[in-house]
Amino acid sequence: MKVLVVVDAQNDFITGSLGSLEAERVLPNIVNKIRDFDDLIVCTIDTHFENYLETQEGKKLPIKHCVRETEGWRIEDRIEVMSMLYKHMLTVEKESFGSFFLPQLIENYTIGTTIEEIELVGYVLDICVISNALLLKAYFPETKIAVDVSCCSATSPEAFEASKIILKSCQVEIRGE
């Protein structure tokens, strides 16, 4: 079995408070990747609360985003529609860059099967995508972990390139270059 992890494909990361033209540019690639994928898909949902600016993350990144139940928190419409049509799409909320529950959810859902690979796409490569890729690599050390960078955006072009270097050095395969 293969697993596709779609990281934080939420309105605030695409067109909202943390959105960018680059994030909008890669969205069709993510939609196509989901459409063409036949196995398990898991979407992470970055989730914050009204007190976000008082948190450690909020003090270092003082841009309110992905506040639970707001429009910015919601999964982007095209991906949301696909999740309704796709019978093997799970979601997991996370309150930090990486989700401790993501590896456990994947493991529990795939009991009795062999995971051939886990591929990640989404937002933001140098923060949440890299955090989840490394969590998954630590949890599943003998499973191929890959990131399709044609389906990712980052906080800057420099951060994008640095993330690829770090991921490669941690034995995460880079695709879509």
Where does each model-flagged region fall?
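Secondary-structure boundary/capping motif
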Residues: E22, F101, C128, T155-S156
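Short, well-ordered secondary-structure micro-motifs
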Residues: L53-T55, L102-Q104, S131-N132, E158-A159
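Internal catalytic-core helix/loop-beta-alpha segment
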Residues: E69-I127
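Short phosphate-binding/catalytic loops that engage adenosine nucleotides
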Residues: P141, V172
